[in-house]
């Protein structure tokens, strides 16, 4: 008898809440405006540059990224 209410509560806790469309649109507008204000342009190979600053582990991750997706490689 106690299993059904407990199951329903666990199901409600585990299910993701649906995002509010208005809130999501406002958030994406704010992010877009902030990027335009800062005039941020991502240079090619930015992930590879960040990973190279991390040392040996960064070089391994950067090399793996280049084999999987060439967009994260820096041009040489």
Curated annotation (Swiss-Prot):
Its main location: secreted. It comes from the Eukaryota. Expressed by the venom duct. This is Conotoxin TsMLCL-03. It comes from Conus tessulatus. Belongs to the conotoxin T superfamily. Transmembrane segments: none annotated. GO terms for molecular function: ion channel inhibitor activity; toxin activity. It is found in: Secreted. Residues 1-19 form the signal peptide. Residues 20-44 form a propeptide. The keyword Zinc does not apply. The cysteine framework is V (CC-CC). Contains 2 disulfide bonds that can be either 'C1-C3, C2-C4' or 'C1-C4, C2-C3', since these disulfide connectivities have been observed for conotoxins with cysteine framework V (for examples, see AC P0DQQ7 and AC P81755). GO terms for cellular component: extracellular region. Keywords: Disulfide bond, Neurotoxin, Secreted, Signal, Toxin. Coiled coil: none annotated. The keyword Signal applies. InterPro entries: Conotoxin.
């Amino acid at each position: 008898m106690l299993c059904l209410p407990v199951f329903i509560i666990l199901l409600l806790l585990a299910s993701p809440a649906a995002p509010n469309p208005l809130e999501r649109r406002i958030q994406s507008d704010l992010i877009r405006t902030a990027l335009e204000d800062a005039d941020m342009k991502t240079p090619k190979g930015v992930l590879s540059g960040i990973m190279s600053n991390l040392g040996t582990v960064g070089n391994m991750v950067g090399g793996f990224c280049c084999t999987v997706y060439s967009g994260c490689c820096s041009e040489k």
